[in-house]
Amino acid sequence: MIGLVGRKVGMTRIFNEDGVSIPVTVIEIEANRVTQVKTLENDGYTAVQVTTGSKKASRVTKPEAGHFVKAGVEAGRGLWEFRTEGEEFTLGQEINVDIFTDVKKVDVTGTSKGKGFQGGVKRWNFRTQDATHGNSLSHRVLGSIGQNQTPGRVFKGKKMAGHLGAERVTVQSLEVVRVDAERKLLLVKGSVPGATNSDVIVKPAVKA
């Protein structure tokens, strides 16, 4: 089973039959339209390419326009690809959120919020040094970052200050709380990466 591309709407909460509050993320999944079907003979692997949403005509490049016309679908806001195994799809086919009706858990992939250049305390959860006791300048610095003349260098991968966020993140095995096919919504328990209105990829959980 392939995944779908959706849009993170935001978080809210719902109550179950016992009155327990469940924090959920609302993901809007409009129809994913098939723009290309890749085969073993032509492409060396099997996959399906989809688009969703819409894009201003003035923003669609000529190569993109030709690609969408060939598939017979409206230009979408992007192109995404999912590997397939024995599943059959046709150009222009629409895949909707109801494919998750019988799915218990999903993996959600998105781009985390960018936080710019951050220090070790925020980026890696380092503890801070003493506020007093003679420490006047090094409250939030890392401390030692190496050894001595041997090895005479800082090891690769050393946790230091640097760019935080704005990277591809996958949260695994989120429980599917509700599938609302009429309103094109999927509610999953917990948080998912990314800002409001950002694109997310939802797939059946690998570890379910």
Swiss-Prot record:
The keyword Ribonucleoprotein applies. The modification N5-methylglutamine is found at residue 149. One of its GO terms (molecular function) is rRNA binding. It comes from the Bacteria. GO terms for biological process: translation. Keywords: Methylation, Ribonucleoprotein, Ribosomal protein, RNA-binding, rRNA-binding. GO terms for cellular component: cytosolic large ribosomal subunit. The keyword Coiled coil does not apply. Methylated by PrmB. NCBIfam families: L3_bact. One of the primary rRNA binding proteins, it binds directly near the 3'-end of the 23S rRNA, where it nucleates assembly of the 50S subunit. Belongs to the universal ribosomal protein uL3 family. Part of the 50S ribosomal subunit. Forms a cluster with proteins L14 and L19. This is Large ribosomal subunit protein uL3. The gene is rplC.
